[in-house]
Amino acid sequence: MASKSWLNFLTFLCGSAIGFLLCSQLFSILLGEKVDTQPNVLHNDPHARHSDDNGQNHLEGQMNFNADSSQHKDENTDIAENLYQKVRILCWVMTGPQNLEKKAKHVKATWAQRCNKVLFMSSEENKDFPAVGLKTKEGRDQLYWKTIKAFQYVHEHYLEDADWFLKADDDTYVILDNLRWLLSKYDPEEPIYFGRRFKPYVKQGYMSGGAGYVLSKEALKRFVDAFKTDKCTHSSSIEDLALGRCMEIMNVEAGDSRDTIGKETFHPFVPEHHLIKGYLPRTFWYWNYNYYPPVEGPGCCSDLAVSFHYVDSTTMYELEYLVYHLRPYGYLYRYQPTLPERILKEISQANKNEDTKVKLGNP
């Protein structure tokens, strides 16, 4: 009798569970609930580098947003073009063989075109893409080792080709023009680096890996030298924290990347995670990691934002359109901080030289 009652109880539990699941599915359909295709970033590990890849947002081919320039023919890009020459940035993008087609090619088709030089760093060489083969293994525990080898490769082959050296992931979107404005105030021969500054574990703080970080030429030299002299080691698997510790050991300053009114420019998540209040729960690690008090909502982000992380391939093109194409008619930019006097003089002199050429009839 007792065993029959126990069997009935188990049958009741199973039936209840199945009924609950069926009802949940029914309500989802009736209410038109959408499947969340955004990356799952609400993990407990602040150093988890890449979004959970569910395969839903992969695009088959690249898109060329610059193919139709009919609405940009009278656009004045003089300042941006001058900064491109004055503030030279080499970008290297952390990727892997499995991500060249899924992610890296969309970086290549969008923001990477504005780098003075761009390199895609993988564990294996790919001459067609192309990607540099660092001869490492793949996996999160290899990220710092890949980072060290990538910077060593850049130092050996491209040290004189740029003034600043940006590391980004293949799911990071970067606005290079805003980064050049930020860096224009600084001397690349000084030991300094910039990114989204976190505070735990390192006295001066360190830069979030996902939001990307940029080293001055002198900072790059010191970082590479640190491993020649054994002042730093490659034993850690936590890339951004380990690099931050090494920077502090080598007396490389953790710079303040906020804009002139104190708003953050480097962002470790996609825009909506910063802009929408309540998206990131207060128990989330992010709130305790920021070096400067974080702001939630529209005040979170500078109008001259530099980067966003966990950007899937679809959002990569959405950001490209929003940043470089969408404009409200009849508005001039409200927030346009001035350039350093040194840069302004150089631009003015360049324009004078160009005017002289025109007057003399030279092309």
UniProtKB/Swiss-Prot annotation:
It catalyses: an N-acetyl-alpha-D-galactosaminyl derivative + UDP-alpha-D-galactose = a beta-D-galactosyl-(1->3)-N-acetyl-alpha-D-galactosaminyl derivative + UDP + H(+); a 3-O-[N-acetyl-alpha-D-galactosaminyl]-L-threonyl-[protein] + UDP-alpha-D-galactose = a 3-O-[beta-D-galactosyl-(1->3)-N-acetyl-alpha-D-galactosaminyl]-L-threonyl-[protein] + UDP + H(+); a 3-O-[N-acetyl-alpha-D-galactosaminyl]-L-seryl-[protein] + UDP-alpha-D-galactose = a 3-O-[beta-D-galactosyl-(1->3)-N-acetyl-alpha-D-galactosaminyl]-L-seryl-[protein] + UDP + H(+). Its cofactor is Mn(2+). Its EC number is 2.4.1.122. Changing Y206A: Reduced activity. Residues 44-55 have a biased composition (Basic and acidic residues). Residues 30-363 are lumenal. A glycoprotein binds at W285. Residues 1-6 are cytoplasmic. Disulfide bonds join C91-C115, C232-C246, C300-C301. Residues 41-72 are annotated as: Disordered. It is a single-pass type II membrane protein. Aberrant O-galactosylation of IgA1 molecules plays a role in the development and progression of IgA nephropathy (IgAN). Genetic interactions of C1GALT1 and ST6GALNAC2 variants influence IgA1 O-glycosylation, disease predisposition, and disease severity, and may contribute to the polygenic nature of IgAN. This is Glycoprotein-N-acetylgalactosamine 3-beta-galactosyltransferase 1. It comes from Homo sapiens (Human).
